[in-house]
Amino acid sequence: MNRGAKVKTNGDNLALSTRAKKLLTKSIDTLETIIDNDQCSPQEKATIALKILEMAGIFTEFKHHSVDKLVAKAEEKIRRLQSQYPQINLSLSEPTLHQQSESIFLPGTYGEIKNFLSPEENQKIITEAIDKKEEYIKSNTTTKANQYRQSYVLFSQKIPALSALIRERIKQKLPELLGQLNFSPFEVAEIELQLTAHNDGCYYRIHNDAGSEKTASRQITYVYYFYQEPKAFSGGELRLYDTELKNNTITTHPKFQTITPINNSIIFFNSRCRHEVMSVVCPSREFAHSRFTVNGWIRKKMN
C-alpha cells in the first residue's frame, strides 16, 4: 500500500510540475507581449522586464530545457531598455523594505499657482490636447485594478514640446513650493508627466501616488488644469485627504480639502497623501469639452 501511495504522489507531483511549467510559460509570454507595447512607460517596462527575470528564476527549479534561452532573452530586453532609457537605474537585487515604526501624519494641504502659463501657451496646450484625440489610450493603475479609474491618457513621448515647457516651469517654481509643502530641498531625479482627459462619467477612486516600491521615490504630485472656456463640464474636483502612515500601512482620515479645477492653474501636494478625482459630468460628451490636466510626479534621486 505504501509503495502504491508513493507512485501516486510522484504522479501528482509530475502533473503539478507540468501545469506549473505551462502556467509560467503563459505568464512570461503575456509579460513579453506587454513589454513590447509602446504605450507602456519606461518605468513600467523596466518593472515588467525584472518580473520576467524573476519568473525565469522560478522556472529553473523545474529544470526546464529552455531556461538559458529564456533568461538571455529577458536580459537582452533589459539591456535594450537601459541603452534606450539611461535615466532608469535597473537593479536585479531584491528591494529592501524598511519598517516604519513611528506614525507620520500628512495633512491634505497643497500649493497652488494661478495663471501658471501665459494665455497664449495655455491656448496652445488646449488646441494640442484636442487635436491629438486619436492618440489617447484608456488609463489604468499600477495595480491594474478594475473599475478604479476611468479617463484617457497621452504619454509625454507624444507631446515633447508641451512636456519640456511644463517641466521647465515646474523647475523654476520648485524652490518656493518646497517651503509651502514643508519639504526639505532634494535633488530631482525625474519629473514624470502625462496628459489626462476626463469626460462624462470619468473618475479616479481614492489612492496615493507613492505606495509601492516602483513609485517610492515620488515626492510631489502636480496637476495643471486646462479646458475650453466657457467650461462645458461640472464635477471633477480633487479631494485631498489627511493621511497617516505607520508600519507600511496608510490610513485615510475623513477630513479633506476640495480643489475645484481652474483653467491655467497648477496645484502641488505630497505624493503620499491619499486623494481622488470626483466624477465628471459633461452633458455634450464632446471630447473637446473634457476636463484636461497635465499631471505627474517629481521624483527624488535616491542614494
Curated annotation (Swiss-Prot):
Q: Any idea what this protein is called?
A: Uncharacterized PKHD-type hydroxylase sll0191
Any Pfam family from its record, for instance, is 2OG-FeII_Oxy_3
Q: Name one GO molecular function term.
A: L-ascorbic acid binding
> Gene3D superfamilies per the record?
q2cbj1_9rhob like domain
Say yes or no: keyword Oxidoreductase present. yes
Question: Is Glycosyltransferase among this UniProt entry's keywords?
Answer: no
Q: What is its EC number?
A: 1.14.11.-
Describe cofactor binding as the record notes it: Binds 1 Fe(2+) ion per subunit.
Tell me the InterPro entries matching this sequence.
HIF_prolyl_hydroxylases (IPR051559), Oxoglu/Fe-dep_dioxygenase_dom (IPR005123), Pro_4_hyd_alph (IPR006620), Pro_4_hyd_alph_FE2OG_OXY (IPR044862)
Q: Which residues form a coiled coil?
A: none
Q: What broad class of enzyme is this?
A: oxidoreductase
Co-factor(s): Fe(2+); L-ascorbate
